[in-house]
C-alpha cells in the first residue's frame, strides 16, 4: 500500500476539490492511460486494487505506471465516541483527484488488451474515468 515515509503535519484539513489540475493531465510515460473525468478521493487500497486488477489481466506483458500518490491523511474517531474532544487520529491516506488527472499509464500491450485492463481497473475506483491513447492526447 502507498503512503508517505514522513510528513510535516500529521493531520490536514479537508480542503476543496474545485478547479482543474495544473499537472498530470497528459500521458508522460505510456501509450495508453486512464483519465479521471470527475473529482474525488482515491484511497491507497483502491489504487492498489486497481493495480492488481490490471497486472492480473496483462499477466507478464507490458509496463504500468501509477501517476497518483496518496499523500493526504484521513482521520477518524473511534466508534461510539461522543462528539468533540479534538480531531481523530490518522486512519488512511488518500490522493486528491481532479477532472483530467491521469491515474494510470500502460505500454507494451495491444490497444484491446490495454482497454480491457484499464476497464477492469476503472471498476475498482470511485470516480468516473475514460480511456485515452497517446495519438488522441493533444500534448504528446
UniProtKB/Swiss-Prot annotation:
GO annotation, cellular component aspect: cytosolic large ribosomal subunit
UniProt keyword annotation of Cytoplasm present: no
Entry keyword GTP-binding: no
Gene Ontology molecular functions: rRNA binding; structural constituent of ribosome; tRNA binding
Gene3D superfamilies: Ribosomal protein L10e/L16
Biological process terms in GO annotation: translation
SUPFAM superfamilies documented for this protein: Ribosomal protein L16p/L10e
Keywords: Ribonucleoprotein, Ribosomal protein, RNA-binding, rRNA-binding, tRNA-binding
One Pfam family of this chain: Ribosomal_L16
Subunit: Part of the 50S ribosomal subunit.
Protein role: Binds 23S rRNA and is also seen to make contacts with the A and possibly P site tRNAs.
UniProt family annotation: Belongs to the universal ribosomal protein uL16 family.
Family matches, as PANTHER family: 50S/60S RIBOSOMAL PROTEIN L16 (PTHR12220), LARGE RIBOSOMAL SUBUNIT PROTEIN UL16M (PTHR12220:SF13)
Protein name: Large ribosomal subunit protein uL16
Amino acid at each position: 500500500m502507498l503512503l508517505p515515509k514522513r510528513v510535516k503535519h500529521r493531520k490536514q484539513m479537508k480542503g476543496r476539490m474545485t478547479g482543474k489540475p495544473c499537472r498530470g493531465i497528459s500521458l508522460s510515460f505510456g501509450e495508453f492511460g486512464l483519465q479521471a473525468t470527475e473529482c474525488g478521493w482515491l484511497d491507497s487500497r483502491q489504487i492498489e486494487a486497481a493495480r492488481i486488477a490490471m497486472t492480473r489481466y496483462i499477466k507478464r506483458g507490458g509496463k504500468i505506471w501509477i501517476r497518483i500518490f496518496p499523500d493526504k491523511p484521513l482521520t477518524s474517531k473511534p466508534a461510539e465516541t461522543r462528539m468533540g474532544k479534538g480531531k481523530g487520529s490518522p486512519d488512511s491516506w488518500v490522493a486528491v483527484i481532479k477532472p483530467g488527472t491521469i491515474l494510470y499509464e500502460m505500454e507494451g500491450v495491444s490497444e484491446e488488451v490495454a482497454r480491457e485492463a484499464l476497464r477492469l481497473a476503472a471498476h475498482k475506483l470511485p470516480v468516473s474515468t475514460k480511456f485515452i491513447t497517446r495519438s488522441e492526447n493533444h500534448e504528446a
